[in-house]
């Protein structure tokens, strides 16, 4: 199904539409959060997450949602799930009964679950959201990739060794800096003490001995 199918047919004249928008305060753009790419193991269940932020609470009588599938960027979109006051699963032949709604519109979550993922499920999944009085349609786009085998686990030994080495090096540097700072502080204190002693000795020599003057 093409995106044009999303747009509602006008139910009143352009004059009435203009008057309606003039009375409604301008809404802020809706933000939709989805993963750009989702890697899923063949035969497993995949949750296609889609959440949104809106300035307005969700009114189920006005809220609307469309989930569509595309085989490629330039391919036509097929709608497989929508929300019109309730969830409507269109049960495309491609998915049959493998699609379930797992979100909660009242909590700004419209995610879906795809059971038993197959290689032919690979493609683009679009999440379209309208939450009046927001005038902007939210759109999230997920590229689903199906893996035929689990990716090899990354060896974390090297990372641990590098991290430990860096941490040890930083600890040594900090220790050296502290030692240098302590040595400098002790030297400064010693110089200050020596200067004070010299100053006191000079004062004593300047005053002289009173008995020497009497002679």
From Swiss-Prot:
GO terms for biological process: cardiac conduction; cardiac muscle cell action potential involved in contraction; cardiac muscle contraction; chemical synaptic transmission; gene expression; membrane depolarization during action potential; membrane depolarization during cardiac muscle cell action potential; nervous system development. One of its GO terms (molecular function) is sodium channel regulator activity. Pfam families: V-set. Residues 187-215 are annotated as: Disordered. Keywords: Atrial fibrillation, Brugada syndrome, Cell membrane, Cell projection, Disease variant, Disulfide bond, Glycoprotein, Immunoglobulin domain, Ion transport, Membrane, Phosphoprotein, Signal, Sodium, Sodium transport, Transmembrane, Transmembrane helix, Transport. One of its GO terms (cellular component) is T-tubule. Residues 180-215 are cytoplasmic. It comes from the Eukaryota. It is a single-pass type I membrane protein. It is found in: Cell membrane; Cell projection, Axon. Gene3D superfamilies: Immunoglobulins. Residues 30-157 are extracellular. The record marks 56, 135 as: Binds SCN2A. Residues 189-215 have a biased composition (Basic and acidic residues). Glycans are attached at residues 42, 66, 74. The modification Phosphothreonine is found at residue 204. The modification Phosphoserine is found at residue 192. Disulfide bonds join 50-127, 72-75. Residues 1-29 form the signal peptide. The chain crosses the membrane at residues 158-179. A voltage-gated sodium (Nav) channel consists of an ion-conducting pore-forming alpha subunit functional on its own that is regulated by one or more beta subunits. The beta subunit SCN2B is disulfide-linked to the pore-forming alpha subunit. Interacts with SCN1A; regulatory subunit of SCN1A/Nav1.1. Interacts with SCN2A; regulatory subunit of SCN2A/Nav1.2. Interacts with SCN3A; regulatory subunit of SCN3A/Nav1.3. Interacts with SCN5A; regulatory subunit of SCN5A/Nav1.5. Interacts with SCN8A; regulatory subunit of SCN8A/Nav1.6. Interacts with SCN9A; regulatory subunit of SCN9A/Nav1.7. Belongs to the sodium channel auxiliary subunit SCN2B (TC 8.A.17) family. It is linked to Atrial fibrillation, familial, 14: A familial form of atrial fibrillation, a common sustained cardiac rhythm disturbance. Atrial fibrillation is characterized by disorganized atrial electrical activity and ineffective atrial contraction promoting blood stasis in the atria and reduces ventricular filling. It can result in palpitations, syncope, thromboembolic stroke, and congestive heart failure. Regulatory subunit of multiple voltage-gated sodium (Nav) channels directly mediating the depolarization of excitable membranes. Navs, also called VGSCs (voltage-gated sodium channels) or VDSCs (voltage-dependent sodium channels), operate by switching between closed and open conformations depending on the voltage difference across the membrane. In the open conformation they allow Na(+) ions to selectively pass through the pore, along their electrochemical gradient. PANTHER family: MYELIN P0 RELATED (PTHR13869), SODIUM CHANNEL SUBUNIT BETA-2 (PTHR13869:SF3). This is Sodium channel regulatory subunit beta-2. It comes from Homo sapiens (Human). The lineage of its organism: Eukaryota, Metazoa, Chordata, Craniata, Vertebrata.
């Amino acid at each position: 199904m093409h995106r044009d199918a999303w747009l509602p047919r006008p139910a009143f004249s352009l004059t009435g539409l203009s008057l309606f928008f003039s009375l409604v305060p301008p809404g802020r753009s809706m933000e939709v959060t989805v993963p750009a790419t989702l890697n899923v193991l063949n035969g497993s269940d995949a949750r296609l997450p889609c959440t949104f932020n809106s300035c307005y609470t969700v009114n189920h009588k006005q809220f609307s949602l469309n989930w569509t599938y595309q085989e490629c960027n330039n391919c036509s979109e097929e709608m497989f799930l929508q929300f019109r006051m309730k969830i409507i699963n269109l049960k495309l032949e491609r998915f049959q009964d493998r699609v379930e709604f797992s979100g909660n519109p009242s909590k700004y979550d419209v995610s879906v679950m795809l059971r038993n993922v197959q290689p032919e499920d690979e493609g683009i999944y679009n999440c379209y959201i309208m939450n009046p009085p927001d005038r902007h349609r939210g759109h999230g786009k997920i590229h689903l990739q199906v893996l035929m085998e689990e990716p090899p686990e990354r060896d974390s030994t090297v990372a641990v060794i590098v991290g430990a080495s860096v941490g040890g090096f930083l600890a040594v540097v900090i220790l050296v800096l502290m030692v240098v700072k302590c040595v400098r502080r002790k030297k400064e204190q010693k110089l200050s003490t020596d200067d004070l002693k010299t100053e006191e000795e000079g004062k004593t020599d300047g005053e002289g001995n009173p008995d020497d003057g009497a002679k």
